[in-house]
A protein has these predicted regions:
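Active-site-adjacent loops and short helices of periplasmic peptidoglycan-processing enzymes
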Residues: 24-197
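Sterically constrained small-residue positions within well-ordered secondary structures
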Residues: 20, 35-37, 252, 344-345
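A generic local structural motif
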Residues: 2, 30-32, 247
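Sec-dependent N-terminal signal peptides of Gram-positive bacterial secreted proteins and lipoproteins
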Residues: 2-28
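Domain-terminus/edge residues, biased toward the C-terminal soluble/receptor-binding domains
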Residues: 163-167, 175-395
Length: 395
């Protein structure tokens, strides 16, 4: 009996010692109680992408192979080309033998055939949903003429984004010596991709079928299961190779708050998805959406001369919401900037914008419009007003 009691006490002491000496990774967030998050993956990062604030990180600058998360840069260059007008979603892409080959041998594939003609939008779906290496190669060749030239464009764009620890060797993420990036750099390119919201239409789709022009329809199933099972998830990209293990750049939005989680080197897809979900849930608990300016609300009364009736109301063209940390005491300020060089202002005409700052950081802006037709006071008008004031004061 005494022996059992000693064993019991010894066991309790071991548990107590283990709990006291365990050192979990902690959240990097100023001005709050630091929570504890356990991450098994080799590297991880949680960001609020609107401000770029890093909420959590673990080995965020460690160079690791990203597998198909590479395709975030491929999609970014494609979306930039679309949004700049360089290409259109309806443009046709002819699939090369090289593109088809990159989708064979057990690699992720959209099942494209040599000579097959697909639109830019269909190829984007193949990259975003099916993670097709053939689709990524077809897009690369269409945009830059060859995959080699496209990879140069990828690395050039990475440098401009400040991705200091990234080197791309291909457009798909296939294993290749020296093809590396970091969780932090992935967050940077993911943050930039989110500036092209059209892409979320593709990355947030779970299943899609492309049948036009084919005997056998192409069935696309998203490798990112979080878009189906995690509330608000609409992207961005998963990745796996035996070298990289399981990776993801995941994003979700709830109640106007968007978060971005990066996981690299998770041992299996269940842990990858669980840890990305845990990070995003933590992010949602730390931030909230605030409506700062309502559409059509008065922002500024703009005087156009010395006469009291020479003014217009600058109103907001649309709502402006911002994301702030819960409990933050940082001052929120509005700075209206109105064009005063015009002689005449038309009702409904855009006359400037209003900037919103949290502390000294610009977090958003909204266009302003005039609420009326009005002519600016001229020199003669102002002189007459001054004479009237002199006369009234004399009387």
């Amino acid at each position: 009996m005494k022996k059992n009691k000693k064993i019991f006490i010894f066991t309790i002491l071991l548990i107590f010692i283990f709990q006291c000496t365990a050192v979990p990774v902690r959240v990097r967030a100023e001005g709050e109680d630091k929570g504890e998050i356990q991450v098994e993956a080799s590297s991880a990062l949680l960001m609020e992408p609107n401000s770029g604030k890093i909420i959590y990180e673990k080995n965020a600058n460690e160079k690791l192979p990203p597998a198909s998360v590479t395709k975030i840069m491929t999609m970014l260059l494609a979306m930039e080309a679309v949004d700049s007008g360089k290409i259109k979603l309806t443009d046709k892409i002819t699939v090369s033998e090289n593109a088809k080959k990159n989708g064979q041998g057990g690699n992720s594939s959209m099942l494209l055939d040599t000579g097959e003609i697909r639109t830019v939008e269909e190829i984007l779906k193949g990259i975003a949903i099916a993670s097709g290496n053939d689709a990524a190669t077809a897009m690369a060749e269409y945009l830059e003429g060859s995959e080699e030239a496209f990879v140069k464009a990828m690395n050039d764009r990475a440098k401009k984004l400040g991705m200091k620890n990234t080197n791309f060797k291909n457009c798909s993420g296939l294993p290749e010596e020296g093809h590396v990036t970091t969780a932090y750099d992935i967050a940077l390119m993911s943050q930039e991709l989110l500036k092209h919201p059209q892409v979320l239409k593709y990355t947030g789709t779970y299943m899609e079928t492309i049948s036009e022009g084919r005997k056998s329809p192409i069935g696309l199933v998203n490798h990112n299961k979080l878009v189906r099972f995690f509330k608000g998830c609409d992207g961005l990209k998963t990745g796996y190779t035996s070298e990289a293990k399981y990776c993801i750049s995941a994003t979700a939005v709830r109640d106007g708050v968007r978060v971005l989680a990066v996981i690299m080197g998770a041992p299996n897809y269940k842990i990858r998805n669980k840890e990305a979900s845990n990070l995003m849930n933590y992010g949602f608990s730390k931030f909230e959406n605030k409506k700062i300016i309502k559409k059509d609300s008065e922002v500024e009364q703009v005087k156009l001369g010395k006469r009291e009736d020479k003014f217009f109301i600058a109103k907001a063209l649309e709502d402006l919401d911002i994301v702030v940390e819960r409990g933050s005491k940082e001052k929120i300020t509005k700075k209206p900037i109105v064009n005063l060089d015009k002689k005449y202002y038309n009702k409904g005409e855009v006359v400037g914008h209003c900037e919103v700052y949290v502390g000294d950081k610009l977090v958003g802006k909204v266009k302003l419009y005039s609420d009326r037709d009005i002519k600016k006071s001229g020199i003669l008008d102002n002189m007459l007003h001054n004479f009237r004031n002199i006369f009234d004061n004399a009387v």
